[in-house]
Regions:
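Two-component/phosphorelay signaling modules centered on CheY-like receiver
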Residues: 15-32
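Acidic, metal-coordinating helix/loop segments flanking the phosphotransfer/catalytic sites
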Residues: 33-51, 69
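Receiver (REC) domain active-site loop signature in two-component systems and cognate sites
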Residues: 58
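Short, conserved "switch-loop" micro-motifs in signal-transduction and mechanochemical regulators
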Residues: 87-88
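C-terminal output helix
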Residues: 91, 109-118
Length: 126
């Protein structure tokens, strides 16, 4: 029996973090990656995603800019987004949520926390 696995886009400028997320989620999800905001925007035009894991601080187009673009786009506005950031003051969390993030995941994070959050969001949106 073959089932379509949900598709996730992992966006972070740190390759080891992208790899960790993709390995952690790879059994249950199809994972694509982008190392910057511009590549993320291109990937979002090429494929349909069930969830986006998005770093805030990246060179070039920031994660916040990608998130704002997604929320203004009719095709992307309902895709759940988990913002990942080492910045974790109450103001940083509020800023991410106000920009349209569904959840905020502080770096470094626990693997079990990541898995639970992603499964809950993908299950809710699917």
């Amino acid at each position: 029996m073959t089932m379509n696995r949900p598709r996730i886009l992992v966006v972070d400028d740190e390759p080891p973090l992208r790899e960790l997320v993709m390995v952690t989620l790879g059994d249950a999800f199809v994972c694509d990656e982008a190392g910057d905001g511009d590549t993320a925007l291109a990937r979002l035009e090429e494929a349909r995603y069930d969830l986006v894991m998005l770093d805030v601080m990246m060179p070039g187009t920031s994660g916040t800019d990608v998130l704002r673009h997604m929320r203004e786009d009719d095709e992307l506005r309902d895709v759940p987004v988990v913002v990942m950031s080492a910045w974790q003051s109450p103001q940083d969390v509020a800023s991410a949520l106000e920009a349209g993030a569904d959840r905020f995941l502080a770096k470094p994070f626990r693997i079990d926390e990541l898995g639970s959050m992603v499964r809950a969001l993908v299950g809710r949106s699917g």
